[in-house]
């Protein structure tokens, strides 16, 4: 790789077609930077420090020095120029860059990460988003890495995310309906006047350079004059799930629709239980106190009313389940809010709240969704604390998991469907939302640090398998930054 060569990406690709230029950009990954002969030799000889997160910021220095003219944005490299001085930054040798990144203050690292988020919006459609996620443990795969189940989830040189999904596939369903749920939250759930941010790029963890997330939506957040996200002490994260298996048809032979009609006409707890039970694989699992939940369903309840399947003996919680037990204690006394939406076929196309109530279901800390929320909580906490100064040193974001249920459109639906007012139309290509279950998520400090420590250990194993000479990630990185509730 030519990371350390003077020629920029723009200079190298002037005579290439745009597709070839993008392919070239896609090769500038963290893995390929570490493989550079100059970097391998410097690590092997001890000429440079190889610890994280500093080596990640060395990579970012060379990446943006190489591509800034090509992407037409100089903000990231400009931060390095302010830290190092313009002349030194543009003529620095590898050892000088490593020294500068080692001495870099955490709030400067956070500024760099803020601009990376800005430049990677569009997520899977943005090649830079793919490039910067190399060598990173993402929130959606955190549980797999903790369990060391990674045949399809490589940390380094991961398989590119498939973007051309078949329109009827579960993935395509979730992607196209996520926008609708964001509108529902901003129009019907959040108080009027509260700022919402609904598009995020890749958020690298500035404290370790190992973890990263891409959020769905935040409230009590806004855009700065530089178009970076400004989180606050009251920021709330919403992780959205639109699961294909919940989709049903508006017809009498669909058993889910039959149960939904009863719920719609008489919104209440028992009607919701009957509705959830009508789904082939219900999303709520009954678990008695002191017992270990499975990892099958992402919502739990202590109430036997939610016990849908044949009787099963569950294992007792033991000392080996300390993390699960602590997380259950933090979450089991919460309730989820259920919002029943009006049927737009009956309201001239208008979708609003028909009714709402609370139910005794909470998030399953053994499920991947909990780990996803856990890492989002950790990284947003660090962004707030590093960018807002002492006033937000001990603040923490709220986190909610939103389960959205949809039905298929039919001939009775109006051509134009909208949420609350005619300013917020729902695209005719998406399904009709029928209800939301909004579940609060709480993350205790001890289990968070322990989980991150396990993931860092696995990252270190993976990096040793990948390179002859590798970066070093101390497990103490799991506790960097104040994330104590």
UniProtKB/Swiss-Prot annotation:
Cellular component per GO, a single term: host cell cytoplasm
EC top class, as a word: hydrolase
Coiled-coil ranges (or none): none
Gene3D superfamilies per record: Herpesvirus alkaline exonuclease, N-terminal domain
EC number(s) recorded for this UniProt protein: 3.1.-.-
GO biological process: one example: symbiont-mediated suppression of host gene expression
Residue numbers marked as site, Required for function: 178, 216, 239, 241
Gene Ontology molecular functions: DNA binding; endonuclease activity; exonuclease activity; RNA binding
Subcellular location: Host nucleus; Host cytoplasm
Keywords: Decay of host mRNAs by virus, Early protein, Endonuclease, Eukaryotic host gene expression shutoff by virus, Exonuclease, Host cytoplasm, Host gene expression shutoff by virus, Host mRNA suppression by virus, Host nucleus, Host-virus interaction, Hydrolase, Nuclease, RNA-binding
One Pfam match: Viral_alk_exo
Source superkingdom: Viruses
The keyword Nuclease is assigned to this record: yes
Described purpose of this protein according to its UniProt entry: Plays a role in processing non linear or branched viral DNA intermediates in order to promote the production of mature packaged unit-length linear progeny viral DNA molecules. Exhibits endonuclease and exonuclease activities and accepts both double-stranded and single-stranded DNA as substrate. Exonuclease digestion of DNA is in the 5'-> 3' direction and the products are 5'-monophosphate nucleosides. Additionally, forms a recombinase with the major DNA-binding protein, which displays strand exchange activity.
HAMAP family linked to this entry: HSV_AN
Protein family (similarity comment): Belongs to the herpesviridae alkaline nuclease family.
Subunit structure, interactors included: Forms a complex with the DNA polymerase, the DNA polymerase processivity factor, and the major DNA binding protein.
Protein name: Shutoff alkaline exonuclease
UniProt organism field: Alcelaphine herpesvirus 1 (strain C500) (AlHV-1)
Primary gene name: 37
